[in-house]
Amino acid sequence: MGGISVLFLMGVVPFVYIMYLIVLVFIILFLVISYTFDSISTMCISKNLNYNYKLRTWIPFYNKYILGKITNNKTLGLILGVLMFIIFCISVHIYINTEIGIVFFIILLILIVLSFVIDIIISHKIYKNVTSKYADILTVVNVLTLGLTRPIILFIIRNKYSKETK
């Protein structure tokens, strides 16, 4: 009887580990694709506004500041960039340490929600400047998909944002 349970556990544990790796690979793949769309759209929007940020839009946390600068709200962009850096540091800390402190996890969740709200506010300002009719609809779609469509929407409207729309 003990042999069957050992065989069962030997099959379940690798399955759970493989599922964990698959989910981790999909998350990393999504983050890379999202970052690429986000950087390209920020680069094109800043080029349309005659800003010289071609290479700076590819700096991971600085591009959030540039998005804030595009919407004439540097403070929100700076706060978002700092929040994203803190979220990254806490996530690495939680991943590296085997024992997760509940305090770090709660702080991480609060910071993720706060950065999501600030990201939605910045995106809504860009949507409102480009398509004032559809800005609310795009923001609702962005919120309902938990921000998954934000880089794609920004990528689609990147060439419509210029000095005239600002």
Q: Locations of the language-model features?
A:
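Membrane-helix interface segments in multi-pass membrane proteins
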Residues: 1-31, 81-118, 166
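Membrane-interface extramembranous regions at the lipid-water interface
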Residues: 27-83, 118-166
